[in-house]
């Protein structure tokens, strides 16, 4: 009999393509089901997600379906935490497949390390076996696309970090610092983990544990996601009272550089050459990554697809970040519905 009761919370919305395999990976855990509860908090899905989950709730007593009429992730997390009973609270995502030792390993290290939050390495996989989907998955996990987050590029040893995907928390963390910020449709985990470390909490990345996360399956969905990430980042910084890092400005500066540089290049040959050089460098880096990926996956079109996908990520995030700054300066509301 395990000592710790684990409450697993999964915010979901229109996940009919992926939710069954997520649930099956949870049912395959080597942690006793008597010591687990799995709470699927649904944002009132309009596809078959609720029917699929309901089929499982009818068969397994430790699986429950909870309504989230507010739709967004932070509301789902908070409702799940309030309804949960475990002394360990674990968040998962319906787009992921988890190794069978996921729950047991995170629970063990949470207590062995004396940590407040622990998490696994995030391996991004293609939604479908197409060139576009592979390009999205590669760009969404490459440092050139998304920066050098430890949980995305991986580490060799257990290490402290500023955030982990999803997370496994001690329940007392929420009693100490509160719940997730419902203003943050995106980036609520970044804000929460920063709040946790500001209160002296510790977060560890467990590198031997890898989860497979399914990337967005279209360029449009990918752009919407990165726009929202960029949009809410300035609000996170404002709430935490933290200055923005230089790296956060790069996509916005890239966007402004394309717009302003394109205009100014009409009046100066020097600016035109500088403008062309920056665009060429960005394209060259994307093509170089594309060449390596094309050889590995035997998909030659990745050579031209990767620069396109990288550019869309950077421009979408940059546009979102610029819009986020505008909303803060103009005191506008951040009304965005999170969806796939």
Residue ranges with predicted function:
Residues 126, 175, 181-244:
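Catalytic donor/gating beta->alpha subdomain of glycosyltransferases that bind UDP-sugars
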Residues 42-51, 70, 93-99:
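A conserved acidic beta->alpha catalytic loop
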Residues 89:
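Short aromatic/hydrophobic "clamp" motif used to bind/position activated sugar donors
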Residues 4-7, 37, 191:
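Cell-envelope/extracellular polymer assembly enzymes that use nucleotide-activated donors
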């Amino acid at each position: 009999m395990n000592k710790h009761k684990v409450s697993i919370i999964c915010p979901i919305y229109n996940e009919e393509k992926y939710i069954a395999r997520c649930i099956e990976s949870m049912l395959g855990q080597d942690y006793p089901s008597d010591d687990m509860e799995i709470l699927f908090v649904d944002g009132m899905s309009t596809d078959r997600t609720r029917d699929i989950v309901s089929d499982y709730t009818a068969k397994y007593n430790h699986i429950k379906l909870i309504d989230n009429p507010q739709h967004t992730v932070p509301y789902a997390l908070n409702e799940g935490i309030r309804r949960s009973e475990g002394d360990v609270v674990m968040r998962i995502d319906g787009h992921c497949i988890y190794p069978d030792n996921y729950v047991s390993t995170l629970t063990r290290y949470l207590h062995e390390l004396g940590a407040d939050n622990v998490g696994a390495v995030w391996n991004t996989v293609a939604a479908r076996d197409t060139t576009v989907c592979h390009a999205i998955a590669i760009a969404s996990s490459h440092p050139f696309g998304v920066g050098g987050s430890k949980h995305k590029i991986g580490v060799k040893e257990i290490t402290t970090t500023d955030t982990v995907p999803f997370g496994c928390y001690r329940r007392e963390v929420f009693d100490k610092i509160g719940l997730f910020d419902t203003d943050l449709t995106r980036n609520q985990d970044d804000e929460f983990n920063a709040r946790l470390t500001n209160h002296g909490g510790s977060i560890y990345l467990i590198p031997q544990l890898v989860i497979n996360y399914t990337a967005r399956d279209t360029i449009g969905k990918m752009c919407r996601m990165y726009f929202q990430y960029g949009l809410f980042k300035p609000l996170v910084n404002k709430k935490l009272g933290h200055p923005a890092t230089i790296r956060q400005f790069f996509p916005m500066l890239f966007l402004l550089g394309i717009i302003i540089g394109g205009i100014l290049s009409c009046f100066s040959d020097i600016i035109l050459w500088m403008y062309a050089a920056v665009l060429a460098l960005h394209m060259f880096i994307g093509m170089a990554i594309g060449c390596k990926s094309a050889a590995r996956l035997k998909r030659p079109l990745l050579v031209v697809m990767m620069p396109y996908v990288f550019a869309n990520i950077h421009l979408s995030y940059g546009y979102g970040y610029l819009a986020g700054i505008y909303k803060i300066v103009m005191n506008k509301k951040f009304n965005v519905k999170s969806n796939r």
